[in-house]
């Protein structure tokens, strides 16, 4: 796309500011927009390492002023609450481990925002994600693998990608910060966001407890079936977790115990040794295929099961209710609710074939 009208989603960070600058420099008619996603007073804090704060809104506006582009703030709080925050709580209550950033991309940035942008006459949405989107419509990993965000974009549809721009995919984060400095953007040295933006203090367990209440239950040894501890809410745990178990009876062999599973129906957390976490087969639902048509035959590819997780070779096959991945080497800590993203290795940058939500 050349010389089109685009909406730049500006979070208040360095990546989105430079992405907007590059879009304008490429000849596009750029308008900046900051999304007001929460009305929780705790999110209005200074020096935050999350996002979506009042400070972020001001940083985004200042960046737009430097770039001399129009700037607006869109109130998306109600939609964000329903599609991201409430979904986050419901998933934990169901014993799954959601990825709220992925859900925000799927339901807010590239759905609600994109839909409104198109309705207002914009041709595309520009974001600061570190990923590459070529003229062929294929989504690839960023050249900066340490910052690559193709995993959290793997849930998008081909239609959504066709109206998206990711100008930073060919740059490293160091290059982006240096460019921000050259352009006089005050956010050049602003720290990256790491927290869940709507959990202001970083205490996910406390946030869930306030929403779901206290529901005491048993912590059970997966080998013996014996009760080895108590918990105040199974929702506070995730598969692979080691810290915070507070077991009354340590393992006879003295080795650490990890969360193997969460069973909401019985409010039980099952624990066991690290090797019991190893998984060689993954079932997933709600597949989205963006690297080509839905495969009729099993595909040899690579898969990633967490935002910053290991990448392993696998054979992926379509099933009646989703897909099945046979991992060529076992992975530990595979949690239902996370995404499995399939890649086709390519010298020009690994290509995202598709994604699905891990069921078991």
Swiss-Prot record:
UniProt-annotated site: Interaction with tRNA, residues: 129, 338
Catalytic activity: S-sulfanyl-L-cysteinyl-[protein] + uridine(34) in tRNA + AH2 + ATP = 2-thiouridine(34) in tRNA + L-cysteinyl-[protein] + A + AMP + diphosphate + H(+)
GO terms of molecular function: ATP binding; tRNA binding; tRNA-uridine 2-sulfurtransferase activity
Positions of the catalytic residues: 104, 197
GO cellular component: cytoplasm
Keyword annotations of the record: ATP-binding, Cytoplasm, Disulfide bond, Nucleotide-binding, RNA-binding, Transferase, tRNA processing, tRNA-binding
Annotated spans, Interaction with tRNA: 147-149
Subcellular location(s) per record: Cytoplasm
Gene Ontology biological process: tRNA wobble position uridine thiolation
Binding site for ATP: 9-16, 35, 128
Intrachain disulfide bonds: 104-197
EC nos: 2.8.1.13
InterPro entries in the cross-refs: MnmA-like (IPR004506), MnmA-like_C (IPR046885), MnmA-like_central (IPR046884), MnmA-like_central_sf (IPR023382), Rossmann-like_a/b/a_fold (IPR014729)
Main location: cytoplasm
SUPFAM superfamilies the UniProt entry points to: Adenine nucleotide alpha hydrolases-like
Task of the protein: Catalyzes the 2-thiolation of uridine at the wobble position (U34) of tRNA, leading to the formation of s(2)U34.
Similarity comment: family membership: Belongs to the MnmA/TRMU family.
NCBIfam families per the UniProt record, alphabetical: PRK00143.1, trmU
Protein name (record): tRNA-specific 2-thiouridylase MnmA
Organism: Salinispora tropica (strain ATCC BAA-916 / DSM 44818 / JCM 13857 / NBRC 105044 / CNB-440)
